[in-house]
Swiss-Prot record:
InterPro entries: DNA-bd_RFX, RFX-like, RFX1_trans_act, WH-like_DNA-bd_sf, WH_DNA-bd_sf. PROSITE patterns: RFX_DBD. This is DNA-binding protein RFX2. Keywords: Cilium biogenesis/degradation, Cytoplasm, Differentiation, DNA-binding, Nucleus, Phosphoprotein, Spermatogenesis, Transcription, Transcription regulation. Pfam families: BCD_RFX, RFX1_trans_act, RFX_DNA_binding. The modification Phosphoserine is found at S28, S416. The gene is RFX2.
Length: 704
């Protein structure tokens, strides 16, 4: 950069040149926004410009060694313009127009994760834009909007800016190549390439990629055909449409999902956008109620009846968004956190042995019960998999209530086992069958399999972060289960009701425990990631008198001192290494394996597992007691960690016992409740306590 050393009256010429690196010049109240062209015409003469206050320039411009190569520069001074040989046109700064003025109420959503980002009112205002400026810059030199669909977040912990842009879409060049390939392979003429562009835009407007969710291939193609019909477009065939989708959403996979005899091909990793108008169609609401099955197939259970025609539904869809539509969109977003690919296992056959059936009940009726109960359980899985919990009550009422099945007429079986829809079982036969002990035991075993599958669908990983809205919905669902089933089976014998409610109580209690465990995991994750808290915890733990703890606990637990010392050292070492929550979970799993290894394959394995839980809880309570007496600064953190580790130990042990006994965890937790769920069998229990609330304590107390 060159300056004139003359006085204020002498003219001077100044030229700006890009160089290596330097911070940008702070903008003054008077600025000129300059856009540089790629190159200057040959022979162009640079005109000198007089500067009225040239003696002040060295102090302002001397530190600058670089002008950012983004071809946008800020110049200081009054009416002066610093010219550059590479700059063709200068534009004056206009303070009137405003670009994207942020406010405290503005919110943006990132499509893949759904995290909400609120732009604070204290964010720096955006630089007004000019219609001929290629890219708008803020004071720091970063682009405010660099591409369609990207948002800039001002400010943060590290004063950095993050661009929220969906990265899984194909680039324009890739889309052009995809169109060319389709034209060559499918023989599509060039005049139809414009139609392909409109199809691509429709896909980008209505669908997005997301992990852990799926969409039936046929449903997506039906949406496409409806779009072409509404806009009078010529659709491509299904194979070409599949190639088109894979060219837009890179890495898309295909899976065959569903129960046996009713599985469908799904695109795995794609979903409808929550704000897509396709969500508002009544047909799509019914798709989600039936795992988003295609229109041409008859669903096993259709919870919502169609009230309006397709034309009426589509014509009014853009006017109002009903609560049902909002809930459907939210459920579809939550589906990425559950296991929608879970395959429902087979049921065992009832073992009748030499038991004589009651009068009027035949093996023909038993076969019909197997078919209708399997169909009923599959419908339950479909509804839960789509998070439509309120339909469970209607399902149970339709199966058990007297209004749903007539006592008149004979039992009928379908023409083939692949089509269980034709099976019919009158209500009086259903009651008679449930009063048969082998049938009741078989139904309880089926319920254990069903509810364990539902737990694995709703909570596939107890430590994985999930939205609080989904957790609360699951807890509300668990709270209603016992009342729904009792009401639906009001006409059945008390023994049948107690058996059924005993299993569903264990299911509800499992959902409550797992959601509580998940909540503790998210709270503890923040503690384990805080270095200062970890250091304080380690300092407080080193002050605990573990020798005194061992002396007091040895009389009760009778544990080997070497085992206790090894656990103490491993715990301190893991804490000192600032391990993550997943690493702590692996350590706890290894502790359970080491302690129960000597009891593997032994009939005493369940008792040894329960004893280990009691001893673990007693030792941890003694350590917390010592920390409390010493007024440890990290007592709150230790209390949270202790709650999490106790719950996770319970989770690990119940799964080890289930594996050792060949049962499901639901069956292990509900073994006492399955015998009887009445309060008469629970002396000392508080009035009004549900069987599910007694499940955990009863299982631990069973030491024989």
């Amino acid at each position: 950069m060159q300056n004139s050393e003359g006085g204020a009256d002498s003219p001077a010429s100044v030229a700006l040149r890009p160089s290596a690196a330097a911070p940008p010049v702070p903008a003054s109240p008077q600025r000129v926004l300059v856009q540089a062209a790629s190159s200057a015409p040959k022979g162009a003469q640079m005109q000198p410009i007089s500067l009225p206050r040239v003696q002040q320039v060295p102090q302002q411009v001397q530190p600058v060694q670089h002008v950012y190569p983004a071809q946008v520069q800020y110049a200081e001074g009054g009416d002066a313009v610093y010219t550059n040989g590479a700059i063709r046109t200068a534009y004056t700064y206009n303070p009137e127009p405003q670009m994207y003025a942020p406010s405290s109420a503005a919110s943006y959503f990132e499509a893949p994760g759904g995290a909400q980002v609120t732009v604070a009112a204290s964010s720096p205002p955006a630089v007004p834009s000019h219609s001929m400026v290629g890219i708008t810059m803020d004071v720091g030199g970063s682009p405010i909007v660099s591409s369609t669909g990207a948002y800039l977040i001002h400010g943060g912990m590290d004063s950095t800016r993050h661009s929220l842009a969906h990265t899984s879409r194909s680039s324009p060049a890739t889309l052009e190549m995809a169109i060319e390939n389709l034209q060559k392979s499918e023989g599509i003429t060039s005049h139809k390439s414009g139609l392909l562009n409109s199809h691509l835009q429709w896909l980008l407007d209505n669908y997005e990629t997301a992990e852990g969710v799926s969409l039936p291939r046929s449903s997506l193609y039906n949406h496409y055909l409806r779009h072409c019909q509404e806009h009078k477009l010529d659709p491509v065939n299904a194979a070409s449409f599949g190639k088109l989708i894979r060219s837009v959403f890179m890495g898309l996979r295909t899976r065959r999902l569903g129960t046996r005899g009713n599985s469908k091909y799904h695109y795995y990793g794609i979903r409808l956008k929550p704000d897509s108008p396709l969500n508002r169609l009544q047909e799509d609401t019914q798709y989600m109620a039936m795992r988003q099955q295609p229109m041409h197939q008859k669903p096993r259970y259709r919870p919502a009846q169609k009230t309006d025609s397709l034309g009426d539904s589509s014509s009014h869809s853009g006017l109002h968004s009903t609560p049902e539509q909002t809930t459907a969109a939210q459920n579809q977003h939550h589906q990425q956190y559950i296991d929608v690919s879970h395959v429902f296992p087979e049921f065992p056959a009832p073992d009748l042995g030499s038991v004589l059936l009651q009068d009027g009940v035949t093996l023909h009726d038993v076969k019909a019960l197997q078919l209708v109960y399997r169909r009923h359980c599959e419908a339950t899985v479909d509804v839960v998999m789509n998070l439509q919990f309120h339909y469970i009550e209607k399902l149970w009422l339709s199966f058990w209530n007297s209004k749903a099945s007539s006592s008149d007429g004979p039992t009928s079986l379908p023409a083939s086992d692949e089509d269980p829809e034709g099976a019919v079982l009158p209500k009086d036969k259903l009651i008679s069958l449930c009063q048969c002990d082998p049938i009741l035991r078989w139904m309880r075993s089926c319920d254990h399999i069903l509810y364990q599958a539902l737990v694995e669908i709703l909570i596939p990983d107890v430590l994985r972060p999930v939205p609080s809205t989904l957790t609360q919905a699951i807890r509300n669902f668990a709270k209603s289960l016992e009342g729904w089933l009792t009401n639906a089976m009001s006409d059945f014998p008390q023994q049948v009701i107690q058996t059924k409610v005993g299993v569903v109580s264990a299911f509800a209690q499992t959902l409550r425990r797992y959601t509580s465990l998940n909540h503790l995991a998210q709270a503890a994750r923040a503690v384990l990631q805080n270095t200062s808290q970890i250091n304080q915890m380690l300092s407080d733990l080193n002050r605990v008198d573990f020798a005194n703890v061992q002396e007091q606990a040895s009389w009760v637990c009778q544990c080997e001192e070497s085992v206790v010392q090894r656990l103490e050292q491993d715990f301190k070492l893991t804490l000192q290494q600032q391990s993550s929550l997943d690493q702590w979970a692996s350590w706890l799993d290894s502790v359970v394996t080491q302690v129960l290894k000597q009891h593997a394959g032994s009939p005493s394995f369940p008792k040894a597992a329960r004893q280990f839980l009691l001893k673990w809880s007693f030792y941890s309570s003694m350590v917390i007691r010592d920390l409390t007496l010493r007024s440890a600064a990290s007592f709150g953190s230790f209390h949270l960690i202790r709650l999490l580790y106790d719950e996770y130990m319970f989770y690990l042990v119940e799964h080890r016992v289930a594996e050792a006994t060949g049962e499901t965890p639901i069956a292990v937790m509900g073994e006492r409740l399955s015998q009887n769920v009445t309060s008469a069998l629970w002396p000392g229990s508080e009035p009004g306590s549900s069987p599910g609330e007694l499940c955990s304590s009863a299982w631990l107390a069973t030491l024989c």
